[in-house]
A protein has these predicted regions:
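Alpha/beta-hydrolase active-site loop
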Residues: 207-232, 263, 636
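Catalytic-loop region of hydrolases
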Residues: 46-153
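Histidine-bearing beta->alpha loop at or near hydrolase active sites
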Residues: 589-592, 613-639, 660, 674, ...
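Accessory cap/linker subdomain of secreted extracellular hydrolases
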Residues: 55-104, 261-476, 515-575, 696-745
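Cap/lid segment of the alpha/beta-hydrolase catalytic domain
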Residues: 163-215, 256-258, 622-624
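Disordered, low-complexity segments in secreted/periplasmic proteins that are enriched in proline
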Residues: 27-50, 447, 451, 461-530
Length: 751
């Protein structure tokens, strides 16, 4: 347990930081915003919030002092030039004026060299240093252009800004230097630290609870945008893109989904962020002073590229167990977990049906009502018939039709891109390696037949996933870069019809090597655990712990907010006060074991209905945090979206596959035979069954039931801690099931 951190101490600390910074009232006209919380959060006591947010006000001198302190022209940071990358990297600077943990609340920026004339070291506006390392401010060349590797054209005023979100497993991310990864693309690359689960102050006080990770990333966005507006950094404030993998993918998603929503302003204000200030009447000011004029500053984003986004946690226990239970052949390790999954699956059906979801066929590209056209808006529901749909434990419906269509399309897309494979080894039906000329002559149909029958051994262009676990980001050069990995993600032994374990999914059993629930580990109970709980001796004790923890959370944090609801992006997509991104893409591995595919499906549905161009891909064979494969990349997608949505930009079309002209060097086929799961017709279209898709999904199962608010506290529990506890139970749906079915579950618990 940690000591309680007093709000009074926070106020005093903030005042001490700002003392002497000036008290002259700002006369600027500023925009005011009233907070609009999600429905689940309305009616909470906001008295603590009102008291806290009067600390930093636009009417006092605090606005001016914060803006002065966070102006890079006053900081004069260190810049280092990389000749090989032709890029300038800024040393780490603190992004706020009231940092609790400065080593975790900093920012570094990497800038393409073409946009920079040099470093002004004495403030006269001219470039004094053009290479090496120097402290000062950049002299920006706004006439220079960079043509990306995909053919898009950018300038210092129009370049996208990539914000890399860390937060591995929702953990703290220490400050790090921005990588040169995107310099050749013409992008500005931003690395930022963040507080997170298990973060503590020097006195031992716990400070890692939500929404600290997300708030620090929002503050980094504000800092960089502010300095772009000042002319201290190149880049466009209109084209910020978040990216990250796993826990980082969750935060990339949440950063975009909650763009500039006022529910987070109080937390940003408390940290001393730029461009968000409280007014004495309870409203907010969200402008900064640029050349004597007030300019709106937002923490909103233009786009999002998330890999294995582990969000929304509020839905995650239901979605994972629904997917488990959808596979009527899945073997749970205990009767308690099986029964709990059955109950949570029923809760998920009720949850989806109560939302009244719809989707436009034209937006998803699927004929869901079977009328031969893509003109309908279809209601998405889950239905139940235990006799007619026994192979999926009774579940079916239009919502699951969409789920299956996404699954089929993801496999179809994978097969359609096999022409981009460069170093695979292809075999005939008898196991003989094809000659180079035979490989060069392969048609799309030939490759599809070989793939579905498992007549191949992958090369590096088909390896798609990391080794699993809750990563911070998708890999690459320092902070920021495309994902990389070396696992194929095929179904494990016995999962597919052939029982072929050809490079199966990564080992994602997070709870197999560390003790669950220890403060330093924070791991998740694995799917192969035969014990329901090692910490609770009885179901009654377990239930009491859930009731006490969730009551604390629902009572609200220091600002009166339910932190679980704050961290639910579904609450904010399309909500009043949210600036929705123009586009979003979520790439999941189809054999992902750390979260259900239904979570990304729900995000896509919500974003599409809110007007965001939202795409999801469940990469076949991909495990946790899949790599981009077959010619795809973050840069290709960003450039394509830029060409689609920015007037005058280049329309980007993916380069055609060169085709493989020489066979690989493997000596035997290691592919998985999918013909027992997938039908492939003469027109090159494939179909699957819902039960087959569910069986494929459970083949990569890595978590017990429940998978997120785990009974012995897991890695995702720590982000919902408090000032006195670094982990708490938080899933009110799990608690509902425990209460309603206590008689049945108590007899099965730990049996």
């Amino acid at each position: 347990m940690k000591k309680t951190i007093s709000l009074i101490m926070s106020v005093l600390l903030l005042l001490s930081v700002l003392t002497g910074c000036g008290t002259a009232a700002s006369t600027a006209t500023t925009e005011t915003t009233e907070s609009s919380a999600p429905d689940e959060m309305q009616g909470m006591d906001n008295s603590a919030q009102s008291a806290e947010t009067t600390v930093v006000t636009a009417e006092s001198g605090d606005k001016d002092s914060i803006e002065d302190a966070l102006n890079l022209a006053n900081i004069m940071p260190e810049w280092s030039y990389s000749e090989s990358a032709d890029a300038w990297t800024m040393g780490i600077v603190t992004a706020v004026t009231n940092a609790e943990l400065p080593d975790y609340q900093g920012v570094s920026v990497c800038v393409p060299g073409a946009y920079v004339k040099g470093v002004d070291t004495d403030g006269d506006g001219t470039a004094d240093v053009t290479s090496g390392t120097a402290s000062g401010i950049l002299v920006i060349d706004y006439d220079a252009t960079v043509t990306s590797t995909k053919g898009q054209i950018y300038t210092a005023a129009t370049a996208p800004v990539i914000i890399n979100t860390g937060a591995a497993g929702y953990s703290a991310q220490s400050n790090q230097s921005a990588g040169t990864t995107y310099a050749a693309e013409g992008y500005i690359n931003v690395a930022c630290g963040n507080r997170g689960k298990q973060s503590t102050l020097s006195d031992g006080s716990y400070t890692g609870d939500a929404p600290s990770c997300l708030v620090d990333q929002k503050n980094a966005v504000r800092f960089v945008k502010y300095n772009i507006l000042l002319g201290n950094l190149p880049g466009s404030v209109d084209y910020f893109v978040s990216t990250g993998g796993s826990g980082g993918g969750a935060h990339a998603t949440m950063l975009a989904a909650t763009s500039n929503n006022p529910d987070f302003y109080d937390y940003e204000i408390a940290a001393g962020a730029v461009g968000v200030y409280a007014n004495t009447d309870g409203s907010y000011s969200t402008t900064v002073t640029i050349d004597g004029e007030e300019v709106e500053l937002s923490d909103g984003l233009w786009g999002c590229m998330a890999y294995s986004a582990i969000t929304s946690l509020a839905e995650a226990d239901m979605t994972l167990d629904f997917e488990y239970y959808l596979d009527s052949t899945y073997s749970f390790n205990t009767d308690f977990q099986k029964q709990l999954a059955e109950y949570l699956a029923a809760e998920y059906m009720d949850y989806i049906n109560a939302k009244g979801l719809t989707v436009e066929e034209a937006k998803v590209g699927f004929d869901l009502d079977g009328d031969g056209a893509l003109t309908s808006t279809v209601a998405l529901t889950i239905e139940y018939d235990p006799v007619g749909h026994a192979d999926t434990n009774g579940y079916y419906g239009s919502y699951l039709d969409l789920y299956l269509a996404e699954f089929e399309q993801s496999l179809q897309d994978y097969i359609d891109r096999l022409a981009y494979a460069e170093d695979w080894t292809w075999f005939d039906a008898d196991g003989n390696a094809l000659s180079d000329s035979e490989v060069a002559a392969m048609t799309d149909a030939d490759r599809a037949e070989a793939f579905l029958n498992g007549w191949y051994a992958k090369g590096s262009t088909g390896n798609s996933s990391s080794a699993g676990g809750m990563m911070a980001g998708p890999g690459g050069d320092n902070a920021g870069g495309p994902p990389s990995g070396d696992f194929s993600g095929n179904p494990p032994n016995g999962a597919g019809p052939s029982g072929d374990n050809a490079g199966g999914p990564p080992d994602m059993g997070g709870g197999t090597t560390e003790e669950v629930g220890t403060p330093d580990a924070g791991t998740t109970q694995s799917a192969n655990s035969g014990t329901d709980s090692a910490n609770y001796s009885s179901f009654d004790e377990l239930l009491a712990a859930y009731e006490a923890d969730i009551a604390e959370i629902e009572a609200g944090d220091g600002y009166g907010n339910n932190i679980v609801e704050l961290y639910n992006p579904i609450n904010y997509i399309g909500a009043e006060g949210t600036e929705g991104p123009t586009w979003a893409r979520i790439l999941m591995g189809a054999s992902e074991g750390d979260i259900s595919m239904l979570n990304s499906l729900n995000l896509q549905i919500a974003w599409l209905n809110a007007g965001t161009d939202a795409n999801i891909e469940w990469q076949w064979n991909g495990g946790h945090v899949p790599s981009e494969i077959f010619g795809d990349s973050l840069a290709l997608y960003v450039d394509t979206m830029y060409g689609k949505y920015v007037d005058g930009a280049v329309e980007i079309i993916k380069a055609a596959a060169a085709g493989q002209t020489a066979n690989g060097t493997a000596t035997e086929a290691t592919g998985t035979n999918l013909t027992g799961w997938v039908d492939y017709d003469a027109e090159g279209q494939l179909t699957m069954t819902l039960s087959g898709a569910a069986a494929y999904r459970t083949s990569g199962a890595s978590k017990a039931t429940p998978g997120f608010d785990v009974m012995d506290y897991g890695q995702e529990d720590y982000v919902f801690g408090s000032s006195t506890a670094d982990a708490r139970h938080w899933d009110k749906i799990v608690l509902k099931v425990f209460r309603e079915h206590a008689d049945t579950l108590s007899t099965l618990f730990n049996q």
